[in-house]
């Protein structure tokens, strides 16, 4: 993987990730394909929304179908027939979200398989091996996603262990002869001094890109913005920056304003299945009765298949009848909305008009522009 940085506007960056499998224009949004599928979508449909890279989930694919089934097909690309690049998370977030059924040690994490209850062990080395077998174009280190709230002492211990695990991840990744990219994950909760230690430690180890982890886990939005403003300038400018698990459209806008290049989140797909649709002027909750006889398109400014062909009334009807097509059409639209948003941000950065774009984005939704505390 090669990262090319074209231009900046304030702290926002316009560039691209270059892989053997294709080019990803940045800032980018990665749809989430947890089980080897972006829910309800064929790879061709996902690509048609403008997505150039997707995310796969190491933890879930390890449990089902497992490494051996994956290797029978070649790798995850062959298994799911996605031709572009794939980023896989390390499994850390899923393991730590298991709560009481897992035990963290210095060596790794012991837990019960949530499918059948069998005891399982996952550590940095195993995570690197699974992601190698998946053929991931971007591999994420195995870390502990520090929960929120966490006091300073806990956050420090967690961050320091994640740094030790980062070194073990790097060593196993290299020993496998993996020629793809490996990203480090910055931890430290909402504490700037801990984030400083994490960034320096990861940069000393050396990675192809750097993710900001442990945000969007319940902390106030102001804290997320503050940490991004503090951390992003410390990440080497020639490496991509990835904000994990984020988020709402406004979170993408605010991340880009602070220097983030990559995002992922289940929100557009999960919300689509619940009739929660993102449009230029805000949100449409399509199951509301007021859309029963609305013959207009979902979003007159959207060029997706759904908006070009169907009315709000039809989408309302499908939702009320629990028709699978409704979830699919909603997903097509939400994914396209996110890709159109990212394309708009990229164009605005190219033209040096990002703040004008941001102001228009919020004004059209009747909202104030959040403060930006950067030099």
Swiss-Prot record:
Belongs to the queuine tRNA-ribosyltransferase family. GO terms for molecular function: metal ion binding; tRNA-guanosine(34) queuine transglycosylase activity. Homodimer. Within each dimer, one monomer is responsible for RNA recognition and catalysis, while the other monomer binds to the replacement base PreQ1. Binds 1 zinc ion per subunit. One of its GO terms (cellular component) is cytosol. SUPFAM superfamilies: tRNA-guanine transglycosylase. It catalyses: 7-aminomethyl-7-carbaguanine + guanosine(34) in tRNA = 7-aminomethyl-7-carbaguanosine(34) in tRNA + guanine. The gene is tgt. The active site is at residues 89, 264. Its EC number is 2.4.2.29. The keyword Ribonucleoprotein does not apply. GO terms for biological process: queuosine biosynthetic process; tRNA wobble guanine modification; tRNA-guanine transglycosylation. It comes from Shigella flexneri. It is an enzyme of class 2 (transferase). Substrate binds at residues 89-93, 143, 187, 214. Coiled coil: none annotated. Important for virulence. Catalyzes the base-exchange of a guanine (G) residue with the queuine precursor 7-aminomethyl-7-deazaguanine (PreQ1) at position 34 (anticodon wobble position) in tRNAs with GU(N) anticodons (tRNA-Asp, -Asn, -His and -Tyr). Catalysis occurs through a double-displacement mechanism. The nucleophile active site attacks the C1' of nucleotide 34 to detach the guanine base from the RNA, forming a covalent enzyme-RNA intermediate. The proton acceptor active site deprotonates the incoming PreQ1, allowing a nucleophilic attack on the C1' of the ribose to form the product. Residues 245-251, 269-273 are annotated as: RNA binding. Keywords: Glycosyltransferase, Metal-binding, Queuosine biosynthesis, Transferase, tRNA processing, Virulence, Zinc. PANTHER family: QUEUINE TRNA-RIBOSYLTRANSFERASE. This is Queuine tRNA-ribosyltransferase. Its cofactor is Zn(2+). Zn(2+) binds at residues 302, 304, 307, 333. Pathway: tRNA modification; tRNA-queuosine biosynthesis. The keyword tRNA processing applies.
